[in-house]
Amino acid sequence: MADGDYFAEAARAVGCPHAPVPGLGLGPPLGWKERLKAGLANSGSTLWFLAGLGLLYALRVPLRLCDNVTAVTGFLSSLTPKFYVALTGTSSLISGLIFIFEWWYFHKHGTSFIEQVSISHLRPLMGGTESSISEPGSPANSRESETLRHHHLSECKVWRNPLNLFRGAEYRRYTWVTGKEPLTYYDMNLSAQDHQTFFTCETDFLRPSDTVMQKAWRERNPPARIKAAYQALELNNDCATAYVLLAEEEATTIVDAERLFKQALRAGEIIYRRSQQCQHQSPQHEAQLRRDTNVLVYIKRRLAMCARKLGRIREAVKIMRDLMKEFPPLTMLNIHENLLESLLELQAYADVQAVLAKYDDISLPKSAAICYTAALLKTRTVSDKFSPETAFRKGLSTAEINAVEAIHRAVEFNPHVPKYLLEMKSLILPPEHILKRGDSEAIAYAFFHLQHWKRIEGALNLLQCTWEGTFRMIPYPLEKGHLFYPYPSCTETADRELLPTFHHVSVYPKKELPFFIHFTAGLCSSTAMIALLTHQFPEVMGVFAKAVSMISRTCVEYL
């Protein structure tokens, strides 16, 4: 998000009355001319309806409406019950088909087909307009739409999972045991693009080993990539990226991966020092230094993750802290999220709070790790003494209120996480890329942080008692936005691309069934019931049909 967007978000969070609220269309009060135009625009359809009724009443004699109604009534009275059975059965069949189609379309596209057609095609033909007074080309409107467009693009951006697993040592072992593929082609293609961005540059043609690795990162077949890495090592035994590929994809254990990453580190440091000495010679050498820096940071980070997985947590914390000090511009890699998880494992809560104080900032992008870790720290101070019965009788203390508000803030940012922390949904292996505020981010967070919530006594109990209150205390917090922007509508589609097909994707906000699904369901049920009653009790239904026709005739004659 832009800095201005975050300042607006903060102003909304503290209840500032002058904070800009994107998407709500707030502006200065309208003058009497604008209100008059709006009133006339809204009353136009009512006036046309009244004019039509008046015209129909005036032409009732020339059009011989009463005689026509009498003829229709006589025709209906002469119909047999079999006709009504056939009519209602046909209506029930048609409405049932419409209902099935509406239900399928809603589950596939998330909207009603009839409503979409009505709004997109029929409403413009009938003269319907948006209930907005400002002109489409006005500067305020264009600025607001541009801000919202940039916001939605940033919200739907896919990020690399900072805690992603190793393909050979973890993902492949899962496939061997279960026979299921935990990664989607879309996710792996994104990783291939990341590797080409991090590990290649325009001077690769100067070194044959880098040329081979450039082709290896584009290769889709894992055995072909591994074969290309060995070819690169034959050309240059100090090819760091070749060791990286082998550690990621060929190593079947974390110990083997760490050994290969240490070899990559030795080679990467040599290449990095050479690039530092030549960086000012030309723009190509500067690009080469950026590439070698990316390789070195990636290797050190993965070594820290290996140490974390092998139980050497303090060593992992030291590597991460050194990385953050040595390469502060690379904050977009979210190394602080790796550091937070390792510090939580050490139960160094004071250090966790210090990291949050730096990164839980209004000018920095939020994440589930940031929001839920902040909630966990506040929950930790009150969870062991929290009791729903006591809270109901005496109310919440100040510390408990702060903890509940932190949970509500975290749930508003990502509402999918609590079901995984409370084990209401089963976890799967996290993908290599996540969508902020989406189901993929929730899986990645809960996969690594569930143990930290379980370690603190009463934390999950407090979460279970309070997380759903986010949707009760604040009306539509996801749709309208409270502490954050409204929940993006693109998360479901992106998560379905990132997560495997055997996982049931969580969807928020909960979609309500459109009106036309209820309408067609009611129409189908009622016509089927009428057909059944007409078939079973033809005389009674005949009397009922005549009574309805007589009442209709009386109403028309009265008019």
Swiss-Prot record:
Which terms are listed as keywords in the entry?
Membrane, Transmembrane, Transmembrane helix
Q: Which GO terms describe its cellular component?
A: membrane
Choose any GO biological process term that the UniProt entry carries and state it: negative regulation of cell growth
Q: Where is the signal peptide?
A: none
Transmembrane domains' residue ranges: 39-59, 83-103, 513-533
Instruction: Report which superkingdom the organism of origin falls in.
Output: Eukaryota
Subcellular locations according to the entry: Membrane
Q: What is its main location?
A: membrane
Topology in the lipid bilayer: Multi-pass membrane protein
To which protein family does this belong? Belongs to the ST7 family.
Annotated protein name in UniProt: Suppressor of tumorigenicity 7 protein-like
Species for this entry: Rattus norvegicus
This chain is encoded by the gene named St7l
